């Protein structure tokens, strides 16, 4: 390790040289109160910015030990510090001048939810913050004077105001930690009370717009029906009341634009802790809850969908269904079975985004097309089996078919954004609208021993003078490229995650791409099953955190996904 003054001397020595001379700065430097690491230096002022990190020992940072004693509070503290750092950095980004990305100081921008990120990580010894800096240049000539401003004027201020307890509001930070502990208490309370979700009285469920996750202003606050209201005594906040959704089959109905999908959206994101002031802080859902929908054109590999689809006219095997281009019903059947394999205890569905022929067949259709001629067993006929025999609850938004009233344990009507428990009313009316015999074929648990087939790496090479392709002795290194939140490419394959709706952030997608790359290179051997591979990955994550994905150094830009999203990613990876 070198001193900060040695870094200053290095900056002076490379000033006005060609841009690649910046590479000599790579290393670690002791500053007052923290260690600065230059982990990766960009090759060009127009290229992706350089990777920087700072490390502060707990002795220097001064945070109470109870604020990093377990993973929950450590992740919460790290999220809070990242937000503070981003506020400070925004005052200085591009204050240093130059061409291209010169002067950029970039920190992860956190949303309304709390995620474990590499942007800030806290161990028992220290706090590490990671970010990006665009090293300044005039054209492609080094402007080290401007970089000196960043390292010796701007960053010390940002670090001092963001990562030292003495400069932060102790009361505000305490509230942040207490909120996380209260949220975790509710999550555990759901299990104890056989609930799958909780929505507090006073919650603000609508969002500002379709492209914003911030709460809407001047909207109707949530108020639970008396029959579903539960009370909890939280460790810090004290008594809280709200709607408890019991395990089983819950139907959410109501007129168009009355708030059905808004409630479902809040529940699907209730798997994450939300920040104070979000309006959904105390909207908590079973951590394994999975939103499912139809996905026309989806890739499916060796999935046992016989629980829902059987006796195809072409005699195609549905016990090991594979297709490059699934229909809506096939994709939704596969999604449910894959969700079961991933350990989901709650399925969230919206009639609007489901395949109609997969969800329900009305009485008239059953009379015209007999069961013997219909290979699809609709979800209507399987939902009770899923709960009674597999312990999987369903929360379903419906607006057109009344058939679901017959199987629902709880019916919630959204009326002008206010929930009303109409279970008794709906059940009383069911007698007047009987269903035809809807007994499904006997339930059997889907097989879940799918072997992940090994994908041969692409051979690198080039054409010779005569146009003949000459392969390299070693195959090309597998490369990944992120396409925002909605997917990535790995090698020559695209992994489409557009309809994995509980993914929040491109940093989670970045992690998924790295996990899949690691698995393809080191775990997928044609012998291991998908659950075995995912378990091996999570054992590594538990022991080493996201650091094991690093290739030489850990960078900013990774966030932890759930197992459900890891399964969803691997299942969408096209392979032989």
Region spans (language model):
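N-terminal accessory targeting/assembly segments
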Residues: 1-185, 190-194, 205
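Flexible beta-alpha connector loops of hexameric P-loop NTPases
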Residues: 143, 298, 308-329, 361-376
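Carboxylate/His-rich catalytic cores and anion/metal-binding grooves
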Residues: 191-195, 201, 257, 264-295, ...
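N-terminal pre-Walker A segment at the start of P-loop NTPase domains
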Residues: 206-241, 276, 284-289, 293-300, ...
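Glycine-rich phosphate-binding P-loop
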Residues: 240-272
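Phosphate-binding/switch loop-helix module in NTP-utilizing enzymes
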Residues: 320-354
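Conserved P-loop NTPase nucleotide-binding/switch module
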Residues: 340-383, 387-388, 400-428
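Conserved NTP phosphate-binding and transfer environment spanning the P-loop NTPase/kinase superfamily
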Residues: 388-391, 397-576
């Amino acid at each position: 390790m070198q001193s900060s003054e040695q870094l200053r001397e290095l900056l002076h020595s490379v000033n006005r040289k060609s841009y690649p001379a910046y590479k000599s700065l790579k290393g670690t430097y002791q500053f007052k109160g923290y260690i600065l690491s230059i982990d990766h230096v960009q090759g060009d002022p127009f290229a992706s910015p350089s990777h920087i990190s700072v490390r502060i020992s707990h002795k220097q940072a001064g945070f109470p030990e109870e604020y990093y004693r377990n993973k929950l509070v450590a992740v919460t503290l790290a999220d809070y510090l990242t937000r503070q750092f981003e506020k400070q950095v925004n005052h200085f980004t591009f204050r240093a001048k130059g061409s291209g990305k010169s002067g950029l100081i970039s920190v992860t921008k956190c949303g309304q939810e709390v995620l474990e990120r590499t942007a800030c990580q806290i161990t028992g010894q220290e706090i590490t913050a990671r970010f990006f800096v665009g090293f300044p240049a005039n054209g492609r000539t080094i402007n080290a004077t401007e970089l000196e401003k960043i390292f010796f004027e701007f960053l010390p201020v940002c670090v001092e105001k963001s990562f030292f307890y003495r400069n932060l509001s102790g009361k505000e930070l305490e509230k942040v930690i207490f909120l996380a502990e209260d949220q975790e208490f509710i999550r555990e309370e759901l299990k104890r009370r056989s609930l799958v979700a909780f929505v507090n009285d006073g919650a603000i469920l609508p969002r500002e717009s379709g492209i914003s996750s911030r709460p809407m202003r001047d909207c109707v606050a949530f108020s639970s029906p008396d029959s579903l209201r539960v009370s909890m005594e939280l460790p810090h906040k004290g008594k809280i009341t709200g709607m408890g959704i019991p395990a089983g089959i819950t139907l959410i109905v109501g007129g168009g634009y009355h708030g059905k999908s808004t409630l479902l959206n809040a529940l699907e994101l209730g798997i994450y802790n939300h920040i104070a002031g979000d309006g959904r802080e105390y909207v908590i859902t079973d951590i394994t809850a999975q939103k499912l929908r139809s996905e026309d054109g989806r890739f499916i590999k060796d999935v046992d969908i016989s629980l829902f689809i059987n006796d195809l006219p072409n005699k195609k095997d549905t016990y090991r269904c594979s297709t490059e281009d699934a229909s809506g019903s096939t994709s939704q059947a596969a999604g449910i079975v894959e969700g079961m394999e991933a350990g989901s205890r709650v399925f969230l569905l919206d009639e609007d985004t489901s395949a109609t022929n997969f969800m329900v067949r009305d009485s008239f259709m059953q009379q015209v097309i007999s069961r013997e001629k219909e290979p699809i067993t609709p979800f209507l006929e399987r939902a009770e089996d899923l709960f009674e025999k597999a312990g999987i609850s369903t929360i379903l938004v419906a607006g057109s078919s009344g058939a679901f009233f017959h199987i629902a344990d709880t019916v919630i009507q959204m009326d002008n954004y206010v929930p009303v428990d109409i279970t008794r009313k709906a059940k009383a009316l069911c007698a007047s609208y009987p269903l035809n015999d809807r007994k499904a074929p006997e339930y059997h648990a889907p097989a879940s021993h799918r072997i992940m087939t090994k994908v041969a790496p692409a051979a690198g090479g080039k054409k010779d003078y005569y146009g003949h392709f000459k392969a390299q002795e070693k195959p090309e290194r597998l490369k990944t490229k992120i396409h925002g939140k909605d997917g990535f490419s790995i090698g020559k394959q695209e992994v489409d995650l557009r309809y994995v709706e509980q993914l929040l952030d491109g940093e989670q997608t970045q992690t998924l791409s790295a996990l899949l790359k690691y698995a393809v290179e080191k775990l997928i051997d044609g012998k291991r099953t998908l659950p075995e591979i995912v378990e091996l990955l999570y054992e590594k994550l538990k022991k080493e955190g996201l650091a094991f994905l690093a290739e030489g150094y850990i960078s900013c830009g990774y966030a932890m996904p759930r197992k459900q999203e890891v399964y969803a990613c691997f299942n969408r990876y096209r392979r032989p």
